[in-house]
Amino acid sequence: MSEAATNPRPKNSTLIRRFLPYMAKYRGVLAFDLFCAALTTLCDIALPSIMRTLTNTVSAAALTVETVLRLAALYFVLRIIDGAASYFMSGIGHIMGVHIETDMRRDAFDHLLRLDHTYYNNTKVGQIMGRITNDLFDVTEFAHHCPEEFFIAGIKIAASFVILCQASVPLTLVVFACVPLMGVVSVKLNRKLRERFRQQRFQIGELNATIEDSLLGQRVVKAFAAEDIEREKFAQGNRDFEQIKTLSYHAMAAFNTSTRLFDGLMYFVVILAGGLSLVYGAISAGDLVAYVLYVSTLIATIRRIVEFAEQFQRGMTGIERFAEIMDTPVTIADAPDAKPLVVKDGGIDFDDVSFEYPDDHNKVLRHVDLHIRPGENVALVGPSGGGKTTLCNLIPRFYDVTGGKILIDGQDVRGVTLHSLRGAIGVVQQDVYLFSGTVAENIAYGRPGATRAEIEEAARLAGADAFVRALKDGYDTYVGERGVKLSGGQKQRVAIAGVIAMRPRCIVLDEPTAMLDPHGREEVISTIERLNREMGITVVLITHHMTEAIRAQRVIVMDAGRILADGTPKEVFPQVELLESVGLTVPATTKVLYALNQVGFDLPLDALSTEECAQVLLAAIGAKT
């Protein structure tokens, strides 16, 4: 079931209270806007009085040219005032609405940036986009028209009631008796209308998510010749949206029909009761004309409010969906007494660390104790789902530990500011994301203000300088959306260059060579070794390639959230049975030596290179002979 159907709806009064602080910022503009609205309203109210004066004068046979000119001049002046007030009301009101929309979108985006990975794991980007674009546009219209409409309606209804009572109290009471009944029906239909609009907004978010998925994955779509699958997914989403929108229009039709019926009822009452009053001399012809005009004004005002209900409910829906974003708790945040992280060496300690995801009670990490020395090059290996990536995601606090603690140079990561922590930890994801822009902009992304020389130096250290200079526009080459104009290896090296430009003391790399060919893998691993060797950066490398793990100073084997082995490559790789039990590919040289030991040899299993293996075999053969 969709969120539109399961979440309880907040009251309109609650939503308006959430919205008022944004409007209060522009209360001066709002006051002038309402002043202009009052002027236009008074001008509208004056017209029936002019017509009554003119009609009564005619009936008294006292009409003169002077009277006509005076009334015409008054009407002309009122229309000039009305036109000027309408101009400012329309322009200033909409501009105020745009300012409010901008402020709300800024706050929503700022809040989205502070939300953690869990929120994005469970929320479609298409839904988020709908909330900060279409929904807030409806809020703009609401912010402008809502105060105006209710202010104008209040003046017109009150003025009409007073003036109509002056003409005929009994007739006025009969006419206004229809209003409460109309209000009850309108409130009931309004609730249904709001629910339809919410469902409509949710469904357009789902459709946006489907479109985004298909367009961003168009290379995969074409690779699998899956255009028909995507067409069907889109068609289904489109049909669902069509169905919801059809139901919305049915609700609107019922709403508008009820309005017209009540309009007709009020006119019927006026014609019947007013005509009888005129016949029996209870009201003059001029008063009846004015009465009909004021009733028309009253009915037009009520109809305008009722028609505004659609826009009102759209605005309420937009505010509600905005509030849902703002009410999403920020679970990863600075502690009240957080201090900047001070990194001198770059040592990392995991002290009895356990972790489980918020929406899953299965422990992903179980009492992990691990000390990574400053400047050490560590490889994490193990099967998929063993906890390697999760362990590394805890270092920059993409998630918080559920047990134990993580220390960097003796400082608990939960006690330091996120900005300083993530500025000291460089992270290169397996699925590299480059922003739409130039190579230079992507390298400098984590360090705004970096000079061109610093950008080029970072690229050189990452092994990217040569290929970047060979591009058509060098460092000013546009990389395309998500870096589609670069190869996998090029994107990886640009990403590493971006991390280097940050000047971190620790780098975490999650399968950085998973999608590269052997040549690309060699270049990336050589870059990592150079960073570790020349700059003393602590390196944590997650990899499935044992040939890469061999080159690390230390290898840690993980499975089911636990550390199974920890040591140098020559200490870990001889544990053939352990490695194979967790699905790891043991180096061929080690497997050869291990097999020989199974048939009676007693060979050391730490000969990792081909040359070392050959030397061990020659020595063993010599000893046998």
Language-model regions, residue ranges each:
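Alpha-helical transmembrane segments of multi-pass membrane proteins
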Residues: 78-97, 148-155, 176-200, 255, ...
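Membrane-integrated ABC transporters
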Residues: 1-44, 59-71, 89-93, 97, ...
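Transmembrane helices of ABC transporter permease
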Residues: 25, 29-42, 75, 148-199, ...
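Helix-loop-helix
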Residues: 60-73, 163-177, 247-320, 325-326
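ABC-type nucleotide-binding domain
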Residues: 341-506
